[in-house]
């Protein structure tokens, strides 16, 4: 019987234990700090695990990330370099992220930011609506989450563009790639939604150059990682009027410090990194399926690729 060790400072241990038991009753489960014999552990299920914990497990075969990204795993300087890391790829997580992206786009598209200001001033004013079929949304990142966002925004009638590092094809989406394609897409889109993985290539991608390429009065929604955005460039574009507003769920420093100007800026809407919450009942299916693949010696489709950074 294989055993998995869970180590997370924020995820519900009992829900994970029960959910994994439903999907894989034969799997042993332990939760840090109750490791027991480290040699018993075959798999680690982690989110910001204590540094050195994974290296202390002599027989661990793989690390499962309790997040779509793997930056928290890679932050451990003692992480064994040969160890496979499995990304959390979950349909329900992708659906939640897409819900948030749609909400962010529709918030601005239907003028909710304007109507909130008018409500607080007790003014009965109407804004003329935009024609959705003439309005373009750009998705930065066309993986599982970006693809779901693109399909659902397309179903609402928007023109949908997507950008990725390399060439891609997706039905109903005008696809762009590479540095030139990024600015080309930005120039056509009123709204940009970032769902990229954070890598050395995408760090700071939401910067003054990208913003300047957008039409006057555009909007940005970032639900990926705070490291994608250059805060000073966003604030400057908001204050100049080049950007009409931003909707952020992620930040360069989390929790967002109380003194940060985002809290009080009237063109900024913020939430505390909640766009995609991992629900154990759904994610346990993915974890169990991939453990079975490891046990059978079968290919694991959700492995983190260190050469690509995601």
Which residues make up each language-model segment?
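NAD(P)-binding Rossmann-fold cofactor-contacting core
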Residues: 155-172
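Phosphate/diphosphate ligand-binding glycine-rich loop within oxidoreductases
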Residues: 42-116
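Oxidoreductase and adenylate-handling cofactor-binding alpha/beta cores
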Residues: 98-114, 155-156, 286-294, 298
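Rossmann-like adenosine-cofactor binding region
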Residues: 167-261
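N-terminal glycine-/charge-rich "phosphate-binding" loop or analogous flexible N-terminal tail
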Residues: 1-41
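Glycine-rich NAD(P)-binding loop of Rossmann-like domains
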Residues: 115-148, 175
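Short acidic low-complexity segments
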Residues: 29-40, 51-54, 173-188
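Rossmann-like dinucleotide-binding domain for NAD(H)/NADP(H)
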Residues: 217, 223-310
